[in-house]
Design a protein with these regions (language model features):
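Hydrophobic micro-packing sites on short alpha-helices
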Residues: 45, 55, 80-88, 94-96
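Histidine-centered metal-chelating micro-motifs
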Residues: 168, 191, 198, 207, ...
Length: 241
């Protein structure tokens, strides 16, 4: 693991490729997930009695952006998703519910007996096979694969893939929320900026940090990064820079 000072952030930001918001292609995985995610965000907003403008103020974005997310036109970035969930008092995983189609398989390949995804045992254990993971592709080249068959109370467990240039770059608002985060890098090199420190994690390297400390995570390299994250008390943002 290499650690560098915050003085290098401006140079790294200039080297990051620009990310553009685009409408998901009809019938694509992103389109399918966006169509499910948006209505659930809207339903949660209405339950809280918030208007579009009120939620937009909480998230620090435009009402039109919230409308596009709710209508499945675009997917939120990681900072926006955390901010939305915090404003609505929900977890990020709760937006990807069991009835949503799985990201890697068709219903015919899963079979009617739900092979690969068992019901909780008497001891509360749950099993999930790789092909039955639920996948959510966010803005800015970030893909989450949930490693639990159903949302876990107070915890989020997922494999995260960052495309080259993907993630929360130095030019983006930092993320800050309650809890603690644990990360293990499997492939590629991941840059993690926590407070005033910057870490470069290669395969096999890990990091643990307090989620209340403003942080950013991105892939400054030229190959995808695969990592595993465990977030305790995830989704309850306190604010952002």
């Amino acid at each position: 693991m290499r650690r560098s000072s915050v003085n290098s952030l401006a140079r790294d930001a200039e080297a990051m490729p620009q990310q553009h918001t685009s409408r998901p292609a009809p019938g694509s995985e992103l389109s399918s997930v966006a169509e499910h995610l948006g209505p659930r965000i809207k339903a949660a907003r209405l339950r809280r009695g918030l208007g579009l403008r009120e939620l937009a103020r909480e998230v620090s974005c435009s009402p039109s952006m919230i409308s596009q997310i709710e209508n499945g036109i675009t997917m939120p970035s990681v900072p926006n998703l955390y901010a939305i969930c915090t404003a609505l008092g929900i977890s990020t995983d709760s937006l990807v519910v069991p009835e949503m189609s799985f990201g890697r398989t068709s219903s015919s390949s899963r079979g009617q007996d739900g092979a690969g995804q068992s019901s909780p045992s008497a001891h509360g254990s749950k099993h999930l096979s790789p092909e039955n993971r639920r996948v959510i592709t966010l803005e800015r080249g970030v893909q989450w694969e949930l490693l639990t068959p159903t949302p876990e109370q107070g915890a989020e467990f997922r494999e995260v893939t960052y495309a080259p240039g993907g993630g929360t770059s130095p030019s983006d608002p930092a993320i800050r929320h309650n809890g603690r985060e644990y990360c293990l890098v499997l492939e590629g090199e991941l840059t993690v900026h926590v407070g005033f420190e910057e870490y470069h994690l290669s395969p096999g390297h890990s990091i643990v940090f307090d989620s209340t400390t403003p942080h950013r995570v991105w892939n400054a390299g030229h190959v995808p990064v695969r990592s595993v994250w465990f977030v305790m008390d995830g989704g309850h943002l306190q604010g952002s820079d």
